[in-house]
Amino acid sequence: MSVFSVVMLLQVAAASPLPPQDSTLPLDERIDRSKVTEQPPPVVASVSARPPSVVRRVSLAAAEVPCAASSWHAARASINQGLEFLRARQDAGGGWRVWKGSAGTDQRDRSLAASTAITALALKAFAQVGELPMNSPTAARARDSIRSRVGGTGRAFNPDPQGGLGNYVASAIASALASIEDPEDRVLLRSSVEWLTMHQWDQTEGVSPRMDWFGGAGYGRSGRPDLSNTQMMLDALHDAGVSADDPAVRRALVFLTRTQNLAETNAAPWASGGSRDGGFVYTPANGGESFASEAAGEGRFGEKIAVGQPRSLRSYGSMTYAGFKSMLYAGLSKDDPRVQAAFEWIRRHWTFRENPGLGAQGHFYYLHAVSRALHAAQQHTITDVQGSAHNWRDELIAALLSMQASDGSWVNSASRWDEGDSELCTIYAVLALEEAIKPAQEAAPVNSPAAP
């Protein structure tokens, strides 16, 4: 472990302790109390397994990765092509997608801060192959761009002055700076981690552990937490070296448990009345939402389900891999029923051709989540429910290479969530390939609930 990592572990791993539950605290004005559901908080055991180690660089040799040597070489070449595409698209000020705002789910206004998050993700993509600010003008300009936007010397850290995308921006910055491991960044890294833990929904906003918002992260102005924002936060905390025992991670595990389609551990009515398939939905907040339910014609809230049928929500790919990965980062054992149920869902819906439940929508976001999740699971081969064994690295690399354009870029024909933009999709694809060729560690397999 580097000196930088040790310093950051000491500085950011001990976040503020869990505040005592206090019913006298007023509920935050952004929350519509009439929409919040309450159940007894799920049981969140202490950390039962060592979370996967943070790996910050791709492997230097094919022998370090459990995939075909040809796949490793193809991935390295593909990554280089993608990075050259991004290098050519970098703005003179060091950023990507500058002046192209984005709006989060249900956000009315587009925020220009999206460029800061995307620039941070691109910086991480360059850093993971060894292009760092001290040896790469591209990386140096990207870091300077980030510093200038979120608070330089004498200014408070503010990831999104417009308010909507702060969690995404702060998370991307934390992950990027952690990947660089430069002591010069320790103040900004600490600020981004502190911002994330301060803006998590908990008792300080009058949200008790009984409420379906508790432990999640969301968009700043609309407030309502969701799994996409929460997994970004947990990625950042993991990358920055924050302990799985940290109160922020334990709070997030409450939210994760409530987002899973698993009645044994989730008391929400939509989980009890649904498939109980172990997958994950978009959010449990305000009674629950799922984009897969929307895609199936049942309404995002399950409000279009036929009269007389119990309300339920459909699980889908990107959120299931996000939840699975996040539970591993939170220190859940692979024998935990929540982890096993999520893994069983993955085995039943094995594909890289689409985002299961949403088709082409969010496909590259999905592939990035898949790659991080399966690297975190530390399993080289996944056996699907039909009994077919899959080397996920070989298959993921082949899938991404088949979609790469001749100029080194990737783009999604389904433009939802900004995936019609080649810069964003290329960043997702490069990050996914980099996860696939990071050095692997051996670990015990995840057993499905039905396994002997």
Tell what function each PLM region has.
Residues 119, 143-149:
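Active-site-surrounding "flap" and adjacent substrate/cofactor-binding loops of secreted or lumenal enzymes
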Residues 449-452:
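Short, solvent-exposed mixed-charge patches
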